[in-house]
Amino acid sequence: MTKPTKTTSPTRSRDKVLQTLYELELGGEQLNEVLKNHSSEKSNKFYKEILKGVSENLEGFDETIQDYVDRPIQQLDVIEKNILRISLYELKKKELDSSIIINEAIRMAKKYGSIEGYKFVNAVLDKIIKAS
C-alpha cells in the first residue's frame, strides 16, 4: 500500500478545509468562489468530502456545539468553532475512532488556534462524545 502524498494526506486535507471554512466565515465569500482560490484541492477527494459534509450540516453542527458551550456560538473563536465542526463531521461519519478525531482536533487547535484553544476544543469534544 502506498502512503498518501503530502498534499493529499488526511491531515493536510483537514488543515485545508479549516483554512477554507475560515475564509468563508470571515471573508463572506461563497463556497464556489473560495474553491476557485483552492483549485489545487479540487482533485482531493478527502478535502471535498469534508468541506461538503461540514457545509451541508453547518446548522446542525452549530446547534450541537451550542449545547456544550457556555456562550453564544457567534462569540467562539472562528478557528476553534471550525475545528469543532470538522470534528463533528468526522464523528458523524464513524469511520475513525473518536480518539483519533480528538487528537487531530487538538493538533489543529495547537497549530492554528489561540494559545489555550486546544483545551477548549478538547473539553467540548469530550463532552459531546460522552453524551452520545
Protein language model regions, located:
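N-terminal interaction/assembly modules
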Residues: 1-111, 115-118, 122-132
